[in-house]
From Swiss-Prot:
Glycosylation site positions: N36, N39, N46, N72, N155, N294
Matching Pfam families: Sushi
Family annotation (InterPro entries): CCP_VACV_C3/B5 (IPR011176), Compl-Cell_Adhes-Reg (IPR050350), Sushi/SCR/CCP_sf (IPR035976), Sushi_SCR_CCP_dom (IPR000436)
Signal peptide: 1-20
Keyword Glycoprotein assigned: yes
Protein keywords: Disulfide bond, Glycoprotein, Membrane, Repeat, Secreted, Signal, Sushi, Transmembrane, Transmembrane helix
PROSITE patterns: SUSHI
UniProt protein name: Complement control protein homolog
Gene Ontology BP terms: negative regulation of complement activation
Biological source species: Saimiriine herpesvirus 2 (strain 11) (SaHV-2)
Highest taxon, organism lineage: Viruses
Gene name in the database record: 4
Paired cysteines (S-S): C23-C68, C54-C79, C84-C125, C111-C142, C147-C191, C175-C205, C210-C252, C238-C264
Amino acid sequence: MYTLHYICLVLSCVIYFVWTLSCPTRNQYVSVKYVNLTNYSGPYPNGTTLHVTCREGYAKRPVQTVTCVNGNWTVPKKCQKKKCSTPQDLLNGRYTVTGNLYYGSVITYTCNSGYSLIGSTTSACLLKRGGRVDWTPRPPICDIKKCKPPPQIANGTHTNVKDFYTYLDTVTYSCNDETKLTLTGPSSKLCSETGSWVPNGETKCEFIFCKLPQVANAYVEVRKSATSMQYLHINVKCYKGFMLYGETPNTCNHGVWSPAIPECMKISSPKGDMPGINSNEDNSTPSGRICNGNCTTSMPTQTYTIITARYTSHIYFPTGKTYKLPRGVLVIILTTSFIIIGIILTGVCLHRCRVCMSGQ
């Protein structure tokens, strides 16, 4: 057999002594991407058929062949990239894909706030054993953030006691004896997304003391607890000629006096009746009787604010009716409709009605 080389074509003399065109060797076959020819070294006379295989990561369905026809190979279809399966949802996280899931694509994983990523942050669609493709490495896990046990406090405790704490767990602090101790600092703490307790700041149970008040025109009796100044009690005693305005005894409650410290106001009985009200008093009336406030017919019907040593209330005075005032009670009538002789505080005129006290 003889071979004739002419330009780029190869002629072969076959058994019938006829010159025919041959196809290029497979290493010259580069017109189709990602294609490998079967291991056949040639020559490739007219009619030769070779199986076509795709490179790694590419596939062709069905399996195809190429044939030498008049010096040219038939053109196969292109090999397509293999495709990985759609990733499963990442519990407590999310992912993004570049490459549309095909061979060579990459997934990037991130976890939601309050969760830690355990594993690789990325996976790639790579070739596996047997020619298949799959995501490598396996997807990570998003594990909830954990906090160390919350700080303990002296003379106090917290709620939600358990072996371990996770993101969004909350504890609330309280003092063992809330009548003596005051909670300072954050009363509640939260296990945050960083695995630390917030807000910052130390929580304590402390004894908070009250300052001994200075009351004008009075002296203060002190009764101190044997265990703590937190249980400090006082009684305010007005000097002669002054009357208590407010309430006593008073207790130091978490640094605040309760009820509020009273005042001692000078006793005065202005002569004459209050406009619209007749103050009827009989100085010879024995102690224990009552004073009558008698509303005259000339006074328009209206409501006054009555403040006594023990309460504050609104009293309605209907025309022609009598309002009886308990003995021993200082009554202050506030009004802005007319001026009354008395004490002016913050623009409000105060008038003390005369009171039956020990016949005086």
